[in-house]
Design a protein with these regions (language model features):
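Sec-dependent, cleavable N-terminal signal peptides
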Residues: 1-26
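Surface-exposed repetitive/solenoidal architectures
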Residues: 24-382
Length: 382
């Protein structure tokens, strides 16, 4: 599905005075005072004439508008260019960076339940590079439990939308959950979105390294970490499709009680996932897997896993697996799934397997494991 017309986008870009300016040359800042300028270059926000974002400042302005209460519910956005947020910086796999000075901190689009992005966002196969986050944005929310929460990524908190055709590259999200004066904070982190509720996600790629850590290993609540999305909640009456999504970044955490996945940390609700893969190394604690750390499903007919592949090495001290670490509920089937990475659990008692740590309900068809499994079994442990 594409919700834009190529001709309209091309015409909008031709008319834009910024279209010929290299994106890396456009400076940006997150607004600190009320602004009047629009967070897009052209468009009407409709499916046939979407809002077109062409530079980093417009993307930052969109974040400001959403975080001050505008949801853009039902509107359509597209990218008209690759967007570079920190030109001149290179972000390394070891969590360091190279460049002059310090990179600019990205403020996520949608900070929580009261500041939610509800529009459709199509990257049109463009890249967003240079996302850098090392400090949490903390709000008081009720999901997944009442208390202090932080939603980090390009988007923080999104709902009832579509995120598609976006690649996150040359970026670094490395967060410390210890904040002075806050005893307990629950964190949802993904390079694309921290939390995506009732949202369709397809053709999205993460190449960034994403991690959450603690200096003291205390003060951090139940958290969700994914290469693309930290956690997704899906209403009981719905089912969403996730397809053609891939991760190559290293995803890691030392926090206790964290669900970690190469694509999604946690999915709560019915979904179908197809044609997705992970090629990054995953290091977690409680639940860790190549694609999804944990799922909670309701209606078996609305669920399914097809054509999934893990190539990364998975390490954890709880339930660990190449595809899915733990499933609460039922999944109708898993078809054509393969794990080629090594799976290691350091826990004495855990559900760990080459493909699935825990798989309840349906059929496993034409799935196989080619990686070494330490602390579990070949395809499914339980």
């Amino acid at each position: 599905m594409k919700f834009y017309k190529n001709l309209l986008v091309e015409l909008a870009l031709m008319a834009s005075p910024l279209a010929a300016i290299p994106v890396s040359a456009v400076s940006w800042s997150y607004p600190t005072d009320p602004i009047q300028r629009l967070p897009f270059d052209s468009g009407e926000g409709t499916i046939n004439a979407p809002y077109v974002i062409t530079n980093a400042q417009q993307l930052a302005d969109l974040s400001w508008y959403v975080n001050t209460g505008r949801t853009y519910e039902g509107a359509y956005f597209v990218l008209g260019n690759d967007i570079e947020l920190n030109p001149g910086f290179t972000f390394e796999k070891d969590g360091t960076y190279k460049g002059e000075g310090s990179p600019k901190q990205w403020v996520p689009i949608g900070s929580g339940e009261k500041s939610v992005f509800k529009a459709h966002f199509d990257g049109c196969n463009h890249k967003i590079t240079g996302i850098y986050q090392d400090s949490l944005v903390v709000v008081k929310d009720t999901y997944p439990s009442e208390g202090m929460h932080s939603y980090m990524g390009l988007f923080g908190y999104v709902a009832n939308d579509t995120l598609c055709n976006i690649t996150i590259a040359n970026s670094l999200i490395k967060l410390n959950c210890n904040i002075e004066g806050i005893e307990d904070v629950s964190i949802s982190v993904g390079a694309l979105a921290g939390s995506a509720n009732n949202s369709v996600v397809y053709n999205c790629v993460n190449e960034a390294n994403v991690g959450i850590y603690s200096d003291s290993r205390s003060g951090c609540g139940n958290s969700f970490l994914g290469g693309l999305v930290g956690d997704m909640y899906i209403s009981y009456e719905k089912s969403v499709n996730i397809s053609d999504c891939h991760n190559t970044g290293a995803i890691s955490t030392d926090l206790k009680e964290t669900s970690t996945g190469g694509l999604f940390g946690n999915i709560n609700g019915d979904f179908k996932m197809s044609n997705c893969s992970n090629n990054g190394d995953i290091s977690g604690t409680w639940l860790a897997a190549g694609l999804v750390g944990e799922t909670w499903t309701y209606v078996v007919e609305k669920t399914g896993l097809e054509n999934l592949q893990n190539l990364g090495n998975i390490l954890g001290n709880g339930s660990v697996a190449g595809i899915l670490a733990s499933n609460g509920g039922y999944i109708s089937h898993a078809t054509n799934c393969v794990n080629k990475g090594n799976v290691t659990s350091t826990a004495d008692n855990s559900y760990s397997g080459g493909l699935f740590g825990q798989f309840i309900g349906g059929d496993i068809i034409n799935c196989h494991n080619e990686g070494e499994v330490y602390g579990g079994s070949g395809i499914v442990e339980y």
